[in-house]
Swiss-Prot record:
UniProt cross-references to InterPro entries, sorted A to Z: Peptide_deformylase (IPR023635), Peptide_deformylase_sf (IPR036821)
Protein name as it appears in the record: Peptide deformylase 2
Needed co-factor(s): Fe(2+)
GO molecular function, one term: peptide deformylase activity
Family annotation (SUPFAM superfamilies): Peptide deformylase (SSF56420)
Superkingdom of origin: Bacteria
Disulfide bond annotation, renumbered to this chain: none
Function according to Swiss-Prot or TrEMBL: Removes the formyl group from the N-terminal Met of newly synthesized proteins. Requires at least a dipeptide for an efficient rate of reaction. N-terminal L-methionine is a prerequisite for activity but the enzyme has broad specificity at other positions.
GO BP: co-translational protein modification; translation
Catalytic residues of the enzyme: 150
UniProt keywords, alphabetically: Hydrolase, Iron, Metal-binding, Protein biosynthesis
Binding sites annotated in the UniProt record for Fe cation: 107, 149, 153
Species this protein is from: Gloeobacter violaceus (strain ATCC 29082 / PCC 7421)
Cofactor, how bound (note): Binds 1 Fe(2+) ion.
């Protein structure tokens, strides 16, 4: 089977998976390694991509859809049909740059909340593709940020945990109906 899934980059009226939000315990669990890549894993990747596109996202981790597995999907250019999305199975960041950048992040699991997060500008990640082959990827800019954000989900970390200005974040969370106590500060 080819590494690339054929998933139209479009919104579905009824996405295949529900996205869990801040406060749901599934988002705080560490995820389990995927031991073998089979049709079930490929189907999950396809459904995650469909769900991500339907929610206007650029990344989604399996725990966000209630699946305790180490898999993320990323597409930082969802408007470009020629650029295929990435499916990273058992991803691991092997190297972080010392150069840090602050940029605004949002999350499908914390809808309508945006805040500045400081992250390394460049990372080197390893993962398995949909054929089980090992891949090493050097990423910069938005792609590096997105990969770090999604891998955080695999370890039970949400972007709101990394926000340095928690005082400014708290009123936003309350306004959108989230409990401030659900944030686990790691900034």
């Amino acid at each position: 089977m080819a590494n690339q899934l054929q998933v139209p980059k479009q919104k579905l009226a009824k996405p295949p998976l529900a996205i869990h939000t801040l406060g749901d315990r599934v988002l705080r669990q560490g995820s389990k390694q995927i031991s073998g890549i089979n049709d079930e894993v490929r189907k999950l990747a396809q459904q995650m991509l469909q769900t991500m596109y339907s929610a206007d996202g650029i990344g989604l981790a399996a725990p966000q859809v209630g699946v305790n597995k180490r898999m993320i999907v990323v597409d930082i250019d969802p408007e470009n049909a020629a650029r295929p999305p990435l499916v990273l199975i058992n991803p691991l960041i092997k190297q972080f740059s010392s150069d840090l950048a602050v940029d605004q992040e949002g999350c499908l699991s914390v809808p309508s909340i945006y805040a500045d997060v400081r992250r390394p500008e460049r990372v080197v990640a390893t993962y398995r593709d949909l054929n089980g082959r090992p891949v090493t990827l050097e990423a910069t800019g938005l792609l590096a940020r997105c990969i770090q954000h999604e891998i955080d989900h695999l370890d039970g970390v949400l972007f709101v945990d990394r926000v340095e200005n928690q005082i400014a974040l708290a009123p936003q969370l309350v306004e959108k109906g989230f409990a401030v106590r659900d944030v686990q500060v790691r900034a």
